[in-house]
Swiss-Prot record:
Residues with PTM N-acetylmethionine: M1
Family the UniProt entry places it in: Belongs to the TMEM208 family.
Protein name: Transmembrane protein 208
Subcellular location: Endoplasmic reticulum membrane
Taxonomic superkingdom: Eukaryota
Transmembrane feature ranges: 25-45, 51-68, 105-129
Source species: Homo sapiens
Keywords: Acetylation, Autophagy, Endoplasmic reticulum, Membrane, Transmembrane, Transmembrane helix
A GO term from the CC aspect: intracellular membrane-bounded organelle
Region described as Disordered: 152-173
A Pfam family per the record: TMEM208_SND2
Any one Gene Ontology BP term: autophagy
Comp. bias intervals (Basic residues): 160-173
Keyword Transmembrane helix belongs to the record: yes
Length: 173
């Protein structure tokens, strides 16, 4: 059963601790996926590792680095001179936030990277990330912009018409 009433807000310290745990968790995912990929592809099958395997590793490292750096900069806390926590940073666990999309990119890259130990064609699944980005761009920015009403005079015209009708009704009474 869901709790009644308003959802409690979280303090700076709790956000700071949760951000630290979230960053640790995603760092473990990154290190684990890279360890599995390097062990299987570049150690066991070193003789058959092609240019594309090395390119995929470089691409995944770039994606991991950019995503993790963005998340850690968003979660950067501010401390006062005496060491007290002034700001816990942005909440990385906030729904529909930018950090949620960065976490999805890290998870997608890790899944694709581990599955690509079996076939390099699995990297085509990474096209889901730009597809999702285009979808979000359309739904949140471009779609509303293209379908927005172009004029505000219409409400003024309707207000005038409504006032006229009210006056006519008053005259009839």
């Amino acid at each position: 059963m869901a709790p009644k009433g308003k959802v409690g807000t979280r303090g700076k310290k709790q956000i700071f601790e949760e951000n630290r745990e979230t960053l640790k968790f995603y760092l473990r995912i990154i290190l684990g996926a890279n360890a599995i990929y390097c062990l299987v592809t570049l150690v066991f099958f070193y003789s058959s590792a092609s240019f594309w395997a090395w390119l995929a590793l470089g691409f995944s490292l770039a994606v991991y680095g950019a995503s993790y750096h963005s998340m850690s900069s968003m979660a950067r806390a501010a401390f006062s001179e005496d060491g007290a926590l002034m700001d816990g940073g942005m909440d990385l666990n906030m729904e529909q936030g930018m950090a949620e999309h960065l976490k999805d990119v890290i998870l997608l890259t890790a899944i694709v990277q581990v599955l690509s130990c079996f076939s390099l064609y699995v990297w085509s699944f990474w096209l889901l990330a730009p597809g999702r980005a285009l979808y979000l761009l359309w739904v949140n920015v471009l779609g509303p912009w293209f379908t927005a009403d172009s004029g505000t005079p219409a409400p003024e015209h309707n207000e005038k018409r409504q006032r006229r009708q009210e006056r006519r009704q008053m005259k009839r009474l």
